[in-house]
Amino acid sequence: MKKWLSFAALASPLVGSALEVKPWLGNEWEFQFDAAYTYSRYPNVQNGHPALRSSSNDQLLTFDLGAVVLTPKLDFQLEAEFSDTPRQKWGVRSTAAQVRYQWLDDIPGDDFVSLTTGANVRLVARHSLHDVSCPYHSDVNVEVNASVGKEWSRRTSWSWRTFAFGGVGIANHGSPWDRCCAVFEAHFTGSQVIKVFGEGYFGYGDKTRVNIDRFKGWGFIAHRSLDIGAGYRYIFDLWGELELSYACRVIAKSYPQGEQTIQLTYNLPFSFF
């Protein structure tokens, strides 16, 4: 069971998200390397001024390194993002670190559900804060979060599972935010996984109008968004897994609207011990 779980333990299930949100952890002292390419496109920013002259075509490269260390209940993750948009050429967008602790684990059967809580900090490049395609509130962003889920097993592997995630955060400038997601995954033929998901992101600033030319992050904007999507993942046993995901934005207020996103992710587990 743990073997199959570890291949997907540190790759985020959501398009546009990278830091882990699942409640399940991988194997102790096993590292997980993730590389993701994301392409997204949106025609405009709801309540944005001035209107975009053309659709925003954005690219994002994300690299993550995570590991379960010290105890089977604790994992760490480091991340770096590189972006290219009409408002900035290829360069570092942000770096982040996250730590999580698992309080309940349903895989051995001792607990009914799995429950994991965590905290992360993200540092954002100043030039990216002036880009409306960058989703962060300010240059230093801190979040606490929790994830709860349950899986149903068949023989030596899980057959399907579902989980929900919620996080609240604050930056060094602006108002707090919260985000949430719900995910359902089904495991077929030992090596194939499909998923469907929904993700919400909400900011509580006092402004509803987005000044695109003088943008300084989302911390002062009362923004709302809801994305839905699906993905397919193929597991190559010892050589990790490859996943293709798609998401579309169905609700946007004071935020990029009509965004469509495609993400290709490769996950490779490895160990030095």
Question: Can you name each region flagged by the protein language model?
Answer:
Residues 42-52, 191-273:
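Outer membrane beta-barrel transmembrane domains
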Residues 17-68:
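Short glycine/proline- and aromatic-enriched beta-strand/turn motifs that initiate or cap beta-hairpins
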Residues 80-182, 214-220:
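Outer-membrane pore/translocation modules
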Residues 53-98:
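Glycine- and aromatic-enriched membrane insertion/assembly motifs of diderm outer-membrane
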Residues 33-37, 76-78, 99, 115-119, ...:
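Membrane-embedded beta-strand positions of outer-membrane beta-barrel proteins
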Residues 19-29, 70-73, 87-89, 104-115, ...:
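Short loop/turn motifs that connect adjacent beta-strands in outer-membrane beta-barrel proteins
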Residues 33-35, 63-69, 97-101, 144-150, ...:
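Residues on the lipid-exposed face of transmembrane beta-strands in outer-membrane beta-barrel proteins
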Residues 35-43, 69-73, 80-86, 103, ...:
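Transmembrane beta-strands of outer-membrane beta-barrel pores
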